[in-house]
């Protein structure tokens, strides 16, 4: 069925500078044991070379999920362009039970028609499991490929794909008038652009529920301040600039509130702002430090870091106040939690015996799993479908972004070429 992609104009980001020094995913572990699949190079039906390798993007997406291992083109028994051309037995002989085929056709109006079919080669050989086509301009060819990937991934795994999401992060470059940059890129590092440049540090970006805004911490006024920036036009709204510390913003899933930490009265405590009215209410109090709030799916409950027991651990509390409940018990300390979109688990930065790694806490069973083995891991952020975590870690003298699947099996890194990269934040579905 023909489907014309309708994407908000705001995401063209015409006001922002597109960068050439982009991050790219480099897989380091786990793909070899993933489910094999065939993603045939999409047939180009125009003159010269295709403007984008759509089939290659689909294959990379499925590989980056950690759940699939597309075979190399030189191992494919055939390279069909349509389902009717697929010979199922040739693929099942290689242990492959599903094949993606497709075409890209240029139109007279300058647009492109991208079509794909997902073909079953084992259960019901030759059956088309999913198919779609998209009419897009050249600049949206990657988006069309990610859309196909999302549909294929969901059909085969039962999990909603997150290949059309984005990541925000802070890059500290070497020198220059504005060495700190808040950037946004597609989840795979492509289409990177600058949201904000600053001579002073930028920290802790957080996405709004609809993906149209970013909250973050800036020090441009000489002290910390919390701001919200609209991506479509660059407009900045100052949220908090109280004495001492203003930090750790987190939008509620329903989009109505922003939680953050302030130390205007001495110790760090949690506060929540009603974004419509601007009214701020205090959630925690006392002499302990309470910070790094993150919301549960109900938009009423917060997980956060507190040192009320001596060392940092993760607790939860109702945003309207009440008694806190401790969530983490394993390890010397746990902090900087992020709760999954379904509320079934959270990830933290866990420290024990001098090591600092990303851990997963199952909120149903209480089971804890250490996911990473990198060095000085920080600021984890979960993909909206709950399958992957992005975080920063130390590598050499700098900081880089890393990916790990929430089962700990698949690992990858996103090295940058022009600075240290910190504070990654995964967007909601866009």
From Swiss-Prot:
It comes from the Bacteria. GO terms for cellular component: periplasmic space. It is found in: Periplasm. Keywords: Cell cycle, Cell division, Periplasm, Signal. The keyword Transport does not apply. The keyword Cell division applies. Residues 1-21 form the signal peptide. InterPro entries: 6-blade_b-propeller_TolB-like, PD40, Tol-Pal_TolB, TolB_N. GO terms for biological process: cell division; protein import. This is Tol-Pal system protein TolB. It comes from Pectobacterium carotovorum subsp. carotovorum (strain PC1). The gene is tolB.
